[in-house]
Amino acid sequence: LPAGILSEVYKGSFNADLYYTFAEVSKTLTHSESSKLSYTLDVPRPLGVPTEQAVLELLVESRERHIDWKVRVNGVSVSKEFKPAVTVRVGENYLHKLIYDVKSILNTPESMNKARIHMTIRHEGGGRINLRAVGFIVAYSHFDAYTRMKYYTGLLLVGEGERYSMTDVCVDGDSLVDLISFSPAPVPVTLSNGSNQRRILVKGLANIQLDNSYCGYLEISREGSNSGSGSPFFVLGLLSKKLSLRKPTLKLASITPMRSGNEVNISLKITNEGDATPDEAMLVVLDKGFVRSVKKIKPPSPGEIVEESIKIPLNLMPEGVTLRLVWKKLARTQFEDTSVKLAQV
């Protein structure tokens, strides 16, 4: 049987927008060098918005089971001890999964006003460790969003010739599924829903997206003969989710470029054709991929038209530019590009 465990840790619904990320890190820390790792999580952070759920997950490899370390998130201590939720031995090494609930930290006034989520790890004793990957799941509370989710997490080693199956995978029969896995070297894996099979090659950290045909039954199997000679393959988590979100949709209703002295003034009318107001909005002027100008604008309400203008110096003026309209809502960022010819202005 596969070593390790995968457990259901959450099933439910909330008025919140869900965001998750899993990133390969591969950073080594040793006590002899007084190692300290600083890492900024690649997570959108709407200012002033409380979190409904926030879970930090670390995948750590070591030669020894005893490690002394401290973990902080946004300057607040998360753990002063190395206490993995799951540990699996692979050859001479151990792979550990550490799971932290950091909701209370992100809901402090200091964290709610920070645009980034920052983590530090200080190695204070024991053997060398390798931080293999970082995972983060966060749900931002708001009446414009509604999420249903079921989340399994842990650390499961599926060896050669082994298989692992799950039933009742999804939060409902119409949700999507994300299977998070890890393998140091390429490994062929077969996924089955009982009637169809999907063969994939996994290398490194992989987020495998599955449709709702896998909701009733999911089987994960490894090719091989139980010789143990191949690369290890781990299942780190499985997330089933269904989201509904009222979204803003910004459009450039009109564009009027006019020359004025030593610059070109572009007058714009921006409309919101969606059903929600953005948290933030901005205009970006691009010339062949280079940013020439950035301007924050008033986020328009649904149906509202906002008038704005942006200026480009003549000495920077190309034949044409791209106007990028960017807007953010909770954990999501969208943009729309429009080309503007300036040669005849």
Question: What is the predicted role of each segment?
Answer:
Residues 275-280:
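Short acidic/proline- and small/hydrophobic-mixed sequence motifs that coincide with surface turns
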Residues 269-272, 312, 327:
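Hydrophobic beta-strand positions in extracellular immunoglobulin-like domains
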